Amino acid sequence: MPYHNPNSRSRRNVLRIVGVLVVLAVIAGVANFLHATTSEAAGNVKPQIETMQGIRQTAQDSITFAQGLDDPDRFAAHIETVQQCMDDYDRLADAKQIKYLLSDNLQERIIGLLYRNQQRTIIDSMRVAAHNLDGQTKELLSAVDAAMADDFSQHAAQWLLQVDDPTQANELIDRYGKQRAYASMREMLADLRSLHKLRSDVKQQVSTAVSNLHNAEAAAAAIAVPERNGDLDPAGWYTLATNVVSTMGVQIEQTMEFNCGGQSGENPSGFVAAYYCQMPDRSQRNVVHMLTTHPDWTQTARSPWLVDMVKHELSHRSIMVSCGTTQPTIAADRTEAVTNSYSVLFFGADRNRIADQQQGVAEYAMDAHSDQLATAIHDGNCG
């Protein structure tokens, strides 16, 4: 009769359980090892790839910025080169070996272990591609910077004279007057965006100043001016002239000596009885000068001609606000005639009285052409 050992079955069960536990422990150990290995591999590479992705994003943002400027075609070649470099980088970054490496799925990361050598090679190539992309982004942003600086150098002095409030124009001038250096292309892009925004704000202020100017001109032209000398006494004529300039935010300054732009004491041809100075520091922007030592001052001060003279000088100012200079290109050698036409057309100065008072002075003589040029300036065409 066979011997029956009741403990043998229990022993076998125990051994089976132990075996299963060992297998599970091995599997868990392998899984933990693979998880740690893949996580470590991804952790070592992710900061590098994030840096490269930052370079790529800056490149894309730089293209978008350049394409949004006034004349993006001038940057077309640079944009195309940056786009090519970005495409080169994207082809590498989109490789399946890199996607396996960075996947949140453990199974895919484990598969990625089979491509370790290829991953290293691709990542090395990505570094080169990102470096090239960063360099070409710098070329693009440098071209944008140069174009913006050129526009600034051509127009900043004009903008400063044109705007009613010079705060932002002075800020723009101050920023361009400083040496600018950047630690990264992202920093350079941020600064150029800021400069562009500031420049756009200043240009909008110029447009607003011109619009306000035209409204004020209409208000000044609406002020009634008596026709005869005896209608007002000298104080009355001066008060009327003051009311006209005040409408424009301007004041009259009486002086005994011609003094404009370093020409102190000089009165061209002895003709000037009133004048307006265009000074780069805006110090004379809102001032009209009356030369009380002019031989005809006593007579002028008792007549509506005083108001016409003031309107002529205000027209110099209006042309400056519109064009950034009292002598715009479109006026050519007819600055004074065009200014007279402007005073008649937009300030309501008396054409016949002006012609009579300036008879024989050819450069001041108005005609249809000077009227046409004055209208063009008022409409925003400075030549």
Question: Where are the language model's segments positioned?
Answer:
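Terminal targeting segments of Actinobacterial cell-envelope proteins
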Residues: M1-L15
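Auxiliary, metal-adjacent structural segments of Zn-dependent hydrolase domains
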Residues: A221-N286
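Second-shell loop/turn segments in exported
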Residues: I223-L232, H294-P304, T325-D333
